[in-house]
């Protein structure tokens, strides 16, 4: 069975803190613990799944490997991978008492494992995420060996029945008063032995390979979105189904725009004269420049909304807006004539601050009252 994403298992986001991960695990462990659900196989499976996810995501090294490579990064059967702890008291006592009372629950030949899921972290520009595109991705993976067609045996030969377990994949061992059933150490639970391994894959049935995929990225994706490509993960063992490929999207910061859901935000500088007298300015959008009418006496920080100039949702197809915040820019590098004109203008305002600068007048009146109250 395909493994679910560990963050999805615990019901937390990819940016969850260790405390949030522990809290989520505790809640699931209380809900699905075998002692609370005797005989419930589904609850037992959910408990083990949550335990495995918790052990990976609370280990710094394992979490880093999982975030980069998905389940393949923590697969103990791959070089450099980390193994998630999957054993618990249920495994031990299930084997012991299962054999005493008539056959262990895990008896029989081990099934060939489905291929591991892969994750590819894809970084996009804002323009690419908003408009969509097709990306060529080069994916390192395990592919079915083309020399032995995934059997692991040398061409012209086939696997033979294991003489240790006689094809059962399990052996019984005495431990004190108990008989314990364990995977066969000779064939590793497969029930078959490859005497003449393939010269290319050395008996594994799979080889390391890189493949190139053309992946269509839909318009409107955002950081945190995930695209699933069924069957594009690692090849399964000895003919088992392949895993899936998950493309994890992240969007780079933009020099002009900030995205919040389907809306875009930007700051647009305007001159003092334009803010005071009004007029038209050019505003950037992802589709090009548009004109924006600025009313006279516009204050810095005022927000203008351009409807339909945001992002089209990848799910609902609703289109967001562009919100432009105008910021008045103080002129610099003035020449003598310009400075003189500003002084003349300032002089015309003397004694009329309430009329021309009501906010400033109100502010200084408040400051004056504050100190009067302080000294009274």
Swiss-Prot record:
Positions with a binding annotation for Zn(2+) 2: 162, 165, 184, 187
Annotated function: Participates actively in the response to hyperosmotic and heat shock by preventing the aggregation of stress-denatured proteins and by disaggregating proteins, also in an autonomous, DnaK-independent fashion. Unfolded proteins bind initially to DnaJ; upon interaction with the DnaJ-bound protein, DnaK hydrolyzes its bound ATP, resulting in the formation of a stable complex. GrpE releases ADP from DnaK; ATP binding to DnaK triggers the release of the substrate protein, thus completing the reaction cycle.
Keyword Hydrolase: no
Assigned keywords, A-Z: Chaperone, Cytoplasm, DNA replication, Metal-binding, Repeat, Stress response, Zinc, Zinc-finger
Annotated Gene Ontology cellular component terms: cytoplasm
CDD domains according to UniProt: DnaJ (cd06257), DnaJ_C (cd10747), DnaJ_zf (cd10719)
Domain notes: The J domain is necessary and sufficient to stimulate DnaK ATPase activity. Zinc center 1 plays an important role in the autonomous, DnaK-independent chaperone activity of DnaJ. Zinc center 2 is essential for interaction with DnaK and for DnaJ activity.
GO BP term, pick one: chaperone cofactor-dependent protein refolding
Stretches assigned to coiled coil: none
Subunit structure: Homodimer.
Stretches that traverse the bilayer: none
PROSITE patterns from the UniProt entry: DNAJ_1, DNAJ_2, ZF_CR
Native source species: Shewanella putrefaciens (strain CN-32 / ATCC BAA-453)
Cofactor details (free text): Binds 2 Zn(2+) ions per monomer.
SUPFAM superfamilies: Chaperone J-domain, DnaJ/Hsp40 cysteine-rich domain, HSP40/DnaJ peptide-binding domain
Name by which UniProt lists this protein: Chaperone protein DnaJ
Lineage: superkingdom: Bacteria
């Amino acid at each position: 069975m395909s493994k679910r994403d560990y963050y999805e298992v615990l019901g937390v986001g990819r940016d969850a803190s260790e405390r949030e991960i522990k809290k989520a695990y505790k809640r699931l462990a209380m809900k699905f613990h075998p002692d609370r659900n005797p005989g419930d196989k589904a609850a037992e499976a959910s408990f083990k799944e949550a335990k495995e996810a918790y052990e990976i995501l609370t280990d710094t090294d394992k979490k880093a490997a999982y975030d980069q490579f998905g389940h393949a990064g923590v697969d103990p059967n791959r070089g450099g991978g980390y193994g998630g702890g999957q054993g618990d008291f249920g495994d031990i006592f299930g084997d012991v008492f299962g054999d005493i009372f008539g056959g262990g629950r895990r008896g029989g030949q081990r099934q060939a494992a489905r291929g591991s899921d892969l994750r590819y972290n894809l970084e996009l520009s804002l323009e690419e995420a908003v408009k969509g595109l097709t990306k060529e991705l080069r994916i390192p993976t395990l592919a079915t060996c083309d020399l032995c067609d995934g059997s692991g045996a040398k061409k012209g030969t086939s696997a033979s029945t294991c003489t240790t377990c006689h094809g059962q994949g399990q052996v019984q061992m005495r431990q004190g008063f108990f008989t314990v059933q364990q995977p066969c150490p000779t064939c590793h639970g497969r029930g078959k032995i490859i005497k003449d391994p393939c010269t290319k894959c050395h008996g594994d049935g799979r080889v390391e390979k890189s493949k190139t995929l053309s992946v269509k990225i839909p318009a409107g994706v955002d950081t945190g979105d995930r695209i699933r490509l069924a069957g594009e993960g690692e090849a399964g063992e000895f003919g088992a189904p392949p895993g899936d490929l998950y493309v994890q999207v992240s969007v780079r910061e933009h020099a002009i725009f900030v995205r919040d859901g389907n809306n875009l935000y930007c700051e647009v500088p305007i001159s003092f004269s334009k803010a005071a007298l009004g007029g038209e300015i050019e505003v950037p959008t992802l589709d090009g420049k548009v004109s924006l009418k600025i009313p006279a006496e516009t204050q810095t920080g005022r927000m203008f909304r351009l409807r339909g100039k945001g992002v089209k949702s990848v799910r609902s197809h609703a289109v967001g807006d562009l919100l432009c915040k105008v910021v008045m820019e103080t002129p610099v590098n003035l020449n003598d004539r310009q400075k003189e004109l500003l002084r003349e203008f300032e002089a015309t305002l003397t004694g009329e601050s309430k009329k021309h600068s009501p906010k400033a007048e109100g502010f200084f009146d408040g400051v004056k009252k504050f100190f009067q109250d302080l000294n009274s």
